[in-house]
């Protein structure tokens, strides 16, 4: 997934994985807020994150669920309805490629409201791009933009990645790569 650290659409509909990846690092989440990024979710994602029955909830999962509830009480990550007509409008149902309702509804709702979609699912990101949607973004892209624009410093990189790993998330390598891309982009912009 190619990213440009100099550009990031600040208003995004987040899918389930992105919600967890953003909230996995309090430092990343705080920097995104400071940069005036705004994230919302669809009711499908809300269900997957907080309502869907689970056999058991690991402590790190409970922590992320608690963080999401706290953010929602503060007005962030608000849930919005996405109807079947929204999904049909972009012919997503025919192109599902084993995507879940959370990813599909996030793409459809983002297109409907003409805002960004943030997904860390490669197939969902590709579907959004293939549908001609310019604002398909990822958590590593957000991270690289925050580094590039100076909202996160070089010293924050290890903190964000460590917090991410401690929360049981799995994109540490992508975050490291995004960090390196942001440094290269910053170097190129001053040359």
Question: Language-model segments: which ranges?
Answer:
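Active-site-proximal, substrate-binding regions of enzyme catalytic domains
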Residues: 2-109, 113-115, 122-137, 141-145, ...
């Amino acid at each position: 997934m190619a990213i440009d650290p100099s550009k990031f659409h600040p208003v995004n509909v987040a899918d389930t994985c992105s919600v967890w990846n953003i909230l996995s690092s309090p430092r990343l989440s705080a920097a995104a807020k400071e940069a005036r990024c705004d994230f919302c979710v669809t009711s499908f994602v809300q269900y997957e994150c907080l309502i869907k029955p689970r056999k058991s909830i690991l402590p790190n999962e409970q922590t992320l669920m608690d963080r999401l509830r706290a953010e929602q009480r503060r007005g962030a990550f608000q849930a919005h309805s996405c109807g079947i007509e929204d999904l049909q409008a972009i012919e997503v149902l025919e192109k599902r490629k084993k995507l879940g309702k959370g990813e599909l509804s996030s793409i459809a709702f983002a297109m409907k409201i003409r805002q960004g979609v943030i997904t860390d699912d490669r197939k969902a990101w590709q579907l959004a791009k293939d549908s001609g949607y310019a604002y398909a973004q990822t958590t590593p892209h957000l991270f690289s933009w925050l580094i590039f624009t100076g909202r996160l410093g070089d010293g924050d990189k290890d903190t964000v990645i460590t917090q991410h790993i401690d929360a049981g998330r799995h994109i540490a390598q992508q975050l490291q790569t995004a960090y390196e891309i942001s440094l290269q982009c910053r170097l190129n912009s001053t040359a």
